[in-house]
Curated annotation (Swiss-Prot):
This is G-protein coupled receptor family C group 6 member A. It comes from Danio rerio. The lineage of its organism: Eukaryota, Metazoa, Chordata, Craniata, Vertebrata. GO terms for molecular function: amino acid binding; G protein-coupled receptor activity; glutamate binding. Belongs to the G-protein coupled receptor 3 family. Homodimer; disulfide-linked. Residues 588-602, 656-675, 738-754, 803-867 are cytoplasmic. It is a multi-pass membrane protein. The chain crosses the membrane at residues 567-587, 603-623, 635-655, 676-696, 717-737, 755-775, 782-802. Residues 1-19 form the signal peptide. Keywords: Cell membrane, Disulfide bond, G-protein coupled receptor, Glycoprotein, Membrane, Olfaction, Receptor, Sensory transduction, Signal, Transducer, Transmembrane, Transmembrane helix.
Length: 867
């Protein structure tokens, strides 16, 4: 290799080395100090893209060209400078005779550029640009304040983790940065997006906005925010109608414009979406709002702004907020910014050679060197929440440094290590603006959010009203302004609300927020708006009609005492009892009269007593049933009526025996006629039936649950026993009817058999009719059916057996004599004998026995023949 070639090669290597070291420094502001703090701020919004697609396009790395000066970024850098100067003046550091210095870099809102700045921060060799002593080593940076973008902070944090240099961000909110296993050196003075997305979901829920859109910037911040927002909206029952993703880089204007147009089309094609949440950049929202105004899309919308652009009112493009709708912005908590504004007013713009802030130089040039106009622009671009967060970050570092340097000499830059400062920061409690603050276990300071409502136009940068505060610890909003009627009028729903009494039915494959409203069926209800399903009523005790908002208690139904029908039947029963008492008294008074003796004598009183029991049994069929009444009513009636019919059976046999002219038949009847035995046997069989019934299959109170009521009724236990009891009574009545029918042609004045026949016909017919009615009838009036039949039977016997005799006793006294009665009997006997002679042609023959029934004995009790 000749000398010339060696010289050229050496020159090339030196040029590359120069490019790799000097040209990549984005240092724009610096100040000396015992402890140096780094700052990373977006002084510019983008870098000029370099095309590396062609083979010939690959060249040595070049210094990036940053474009689009960002005034708010400069403002943030100045806030850090002001905070450092204030800390140096505080007794906390001045008493230790130490100062903080700073080196502030421009990230140009670009990850690669930010990493180049971090490389410069961590460079262990001399700063080539040192004007004083190039051999003096550059002081290491103990902590870094920044950055704004979560995506840049994530990349920067990975590099700073290598030396455990604490990084305190004032605006990066991505949830992933709270993961200390991945980002142990990262801290921040703002809450995580986990809380912001949760607050947004609660805001949507409280205003019943369930059909919304979301716009994000592609990158770690946007993706993380989208993921967290989806998680919280699913919990709150909110659906995302569309997701629009804008490019992270602002340099490729063509791609950005295309994505903005696509987003505008999406918004236009979703007219039901009136609420849009945006985590995009302010410059992207500026283009989006400009497109909305040009397309004349409805301004009846609500835009929910993340902290990324919530205070950037300059994006209105000389328009009014009414042109795009309403903007609700989430901002971090802020404090007193008077000192910072005073700092801006006191800025001294010296000659360029004397100024140590190249960023300020550039901004001054952009304002044509007009210092007063420069200050005015800076004051208008102040983000109060970010200024407060930056001041808090610097204050935290100053307190941690003071704590460490109180125990050691920190004039030497090697006396303190970054990891020691990080450890102290994680545990420090510091004061700022009269309040005490501390980083939590995730390295975050969670102060919550202010919710702003944009007012006025872009010129009113600070005219917004705080309408609410969100406290993450309580998980709710505290509204400062209650008059939010205009916001609450905005409806953002896929489907109209389902009213109480309805429920939502979502078609398969659709969003849960898109549904149709169906009416709740019977015995189901919904008492809230947009119920997911109708709740069933307790079928045992509650009921509801279709489209009901509540369940109604089921009413207990039974044959009530207040029922008009029950009152009528009870009056009839009471009247029957009164008649019984009257007839009992009358028959007892006339117990020796021929009519009473002919009616059965003592048996009459026994029949009256049995009818009294039958009338009383009617009372047990009315009112709320119980186990006792269910068992008592049938048994009382069964015993009473069996006794009554048994006595009537005795009467039937006695009448047949008294007037029977056929000796052989009379002899048979004499053998069968044992009055007390007949009554005892008749009652005994019924007692056996009822005893078995009450022992094995006892009736009980039962309930039948119906649609709107609960029917309380008596369950007879075993209906075979019930019908057996009634069947036995019917059998006795049939015997009575048969015997009475045989002896129906008695003397005209004494036609007891006919009355028995009529009474038994009435009873049998009533109970025959009762059978189909009882079987087919249901409801609370079932007991009334049996009551009616019992009363008919009782009154039938009372009317046929006792009323005619009472009439004779009271009004036909001439017939109530022995002579009148004997005359009728002899007349009946004479006619019977003539009828027999006419039929046979011979005189009737009567066989005499020791014992005869004398017709003169009106009680039909056999008397002995005297010889």
């Amino acid at each position: 290799m000749d000398l010339m070639s060696f010289i050229l090669l050496w020159a090339g290597l030196m040029k590359v080395a120069e490019a790799s070291i000097a040209q990549f420094s984005q240092l724009g502001a610096s100040a000396p100090g015992n402890i140096i703090i780094g700052g990373l701020f977006p002084i510019h919004e983008a870098v000029v893209p370099v095309n590396y697609t062609g083979n010939n396009s690959i060249s040595a790395p070049e210094h990036p060209d940053c474009i689009r000066f960002y005034t708010k970024g400069l403002n943030q850098a100045l806030a850090m400078i002001n905070a450092v100067e204030m800390a140096n003046k505080s007794p906390m550091l001045s008493s230790l005779n130490i100062t903080l210095g700073y080196r502030i870099y421009d990230t140009c809102s670009d990850v690669t550029t930010a990493l180049r700045a971090v490389h410069d921060i961590m460079r262990p060799f001399s700063d080539c640009e040192s004007p004083e002593d190039s051999s003096q080593p550059v002081q290491p940076i103990m902590a870094v304040i920044g950055t704004t973008s979560s995506e840049i902070s994530i990349a920067v944090a990975r590099d700073l983790n290598l030396q455990m240099i604490p990084q305190i961000s004032y605006a990066s909110t991505a949830t992933i940065l709270s993961d200390k296993s991945r980002f142990p050196a990262f801290m921040r003075t703002v809450p995580s997006d986990e809380y912001q997305t949760c607050a947004m979901a609660k805001l949507l829920k409280s205003n019943k906005w369930s059909w919304v859109g979301i716009i994000i910037t592609d990158g770690d911040y946007g993706r993380s925010a989208l993921e967290g927002f989806i998680q919280h909206t699913e919990t709150e029952g909110i659906c995302i109608a569309f997701k629009a993703i804008l490019p992270d880089s602002l340099a490729d204007q063509q791609k950005l414009n295309t994505d903005i147009e696509n987003t505008l089309n999406i918004i236009e094609n979703n007219p039901k979406v009136r609420v849009v949440i945006s985590f995009a950049k302010s410059s992207q929202m500026q283009l989006l709002f400009k497109g909305l105004q040009s397309r004349n899309i409805s301004n009846n919308m609500v835009w929910v702004a993340s902290d990324n652009w919530s205070t950037a009112k300059h994006i209105l493009n000389d328009g009014s907020i009414t042109d795009i709708g309403k903007v609700l912005g989430f901002t971090f908590k802020s404090g007193n910014f008077t000192s910072f504004h005073q700092y801006l007013k006191n800025l001294q713009f010296e000659s360029e050679d004397e100024m140590n802030n190249s960023f300020l130089k550039e901004f001054l040039k952009l304002n044509a060197g007009n210092a007063s106009n420069t200050v005015l622009e800076l004051m208008k671009s102040t983000n109060l929440d970010k200024i407060f967060s930056i001041e808090m970050a610097v204050t935290a570092v100053a307190n941690a440094v003071a704590k460490l340097c109180a125990e050691r000499q920190c004039q030497d830059s090697t006396a303190l290590q970054p990891w020691e400062l990080l450890r102290q920061l994680r545990s420090i409690t510091f004061e700022n603006g009269g309040e005490m603050y501390k980083f939590d276990a995730n390295g975050d300071i969670n102060l919550g959010y202010d919710l702003f409502l944009w007012e006025g136009d872009q010129s009113d940068e600070h005219a917004d009203d705080i309408i609410a505060e969100y406290d993450p610890t309580k998980g709710g909003f505290h509204y400062i302004h209650n008059d939010l009627s205009e916001i609450k009028k905005v409806v953002s729903r896929c489907s109209n609300s389902c009213q109480p009494g309805q429920y939502k039915k979502t078609a398969e494959g659709q969003h849960t927020c898109c549904y149709e409203c169906l009416t709740c069926v019977e015995n189901h209800y919904s008492n809230i708006t947009d119920a997911d399903e109708c709740s069933p009523c307790d079928s045992e005790s509650m009921w509801s009609l279709a489209n009901s908002t509540e369940c109604h208690p089921k009413v207990f139904e039974y044959f009530d005492w207040n029922s008009g029908f029950a009152i009528v039947l009870l009056i009839l029963a009471a009247l029957g009892v009164l008649l019984l008492f009257f007839m009992s008294a009358l028959f007892f008074w006339q117990r020796h009269s021929p009519v009473v003796k002919a009616a059965g004598g003592p048996l009459c009183h026994l029949i009256l007593v049995s009818l009294l029991g039958s009338f009383i049994s009617v009372v047990f069929f009315v009112g709320e049933p119980s186990d006792l009444t269910c068992r008592a009513r049938q048994v009382i009636f069964g015993f009473s009526f069996t006794l009554c019919v048994s006595c009537i059976l005795v009467k039937s046999l006695k009448i047949l025996l008294a007037f029977e002219m056929n000796f052989e038949l009379k002899e048979l009847l004499c053998m069968l006629y044992k009055p007390y035995m007949i009554v005892s046997v008749g009652m005994g069989v019924q007692i056996i039936i009822c005893t078995v019934w009450l022992t094995l299959y006892k009736p009980f109170k039962d309930k039948e649950v119906q649609t709107e009521s609960i029917l309380l009724e008596c369950n007879e236990g075993f209906y075979v026993m019930f019908w057996l009891m009634l069947g036995y009574i019917a059998l006795l009545a049939l015997f009575c009817f048969t015997f009475a029918y045989i002896g129906r042609k008695l003397p005209q004045k004494y036609n007891e058999a006919k009355f028995i026949t009529f009474s038994m016909v009435i009873c049998l017919m009533a109970w025959i009719i009762f059978i189909p009615i009882h079987v087919t009838t249901s409801g609370k009036y079932v007991p009334a059916v049996e009551m009616v039949v019992i009363l008919i039977s009782n009154y039938g016997i009372l009317s046929c057996h006792f009323l005619p005799k009472s009439y004779i006793i009271l009004f036909k006294k001439e017939h109530n004599t022995k002579d009148a009665f004997m005359k009728n009997v002899y007349e009946y006997a004479r006619k019977s004998a003539e009828n027999i002679k006419g039929l046979t042609g011979t005189e009737p023959q009567f066989k005499q026995e020791n014992s005869v029934y004398t017709i003169s004995n009106l009680s039909f009790v056999p008397e002995e023949k005297h010889e």
